[in-house]
Amino acid sequence: IIVSLVGSEMCIRDRILVTHTHRDHSPGAKYLAEKLNIPTFGKLVEVDDSHQDLSFKPDHVLNHGDLISTDEYSLEAVYTPGHASNHFCFFIDVNALMLTGDHIMNGSTVVIAHPDGSMKQYLQSLELLKSYDFDKIGPGHGDYLSNPIDVISWIINHRLQREAKVLEKLNNEEFINELDLVKLSLI
């Protein structure tokens, strides 16, 4: 779909922002950057695991708070590790919009996979997002979401409830196998 938009009126053609380096997000960036002769922005991967696109090397390394400006608006890079150690969301103040990549998705909870993912960082990053003034979430998967504070609060509570179930089971059982713990954490 993206390739078909190249050259159309709908294609922003001055830079590519990569939210993180999982294989469903960054591999096409190099191709598009070369085809359009534009730079990529993102963060290098910190952990080598099977989910990562190790070939991604951004032209510009992002840091929290970096502003990326166009003639019409600025995007603020918001560092949100958790789903991936190099994950960024992008805040567009004039549109009251937070582009969340895989940090918040519509229709499912986010996978936090070891060794690159961190539930502690994920929850901290969700709290950070609550400090921004926006009324729409643009996820990397699924439709736009409204009521962002309600959505974020629900995700945090849901994650903490899952954790509490696991801890309760661990405290009340002499033995529980890993598969049963995983099943319990997904309910």
For each feature predicted by the language model, list its residue ranges.
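A short helix->loop->beta-strand "cap" motif at the edges of active sites that frequently abuts
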Residues: 36-39, 134
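Metal-dependent catalytic neighborhoods of phosphoester/phosphodiester hydrolases
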Residues: 27-36, 52-53
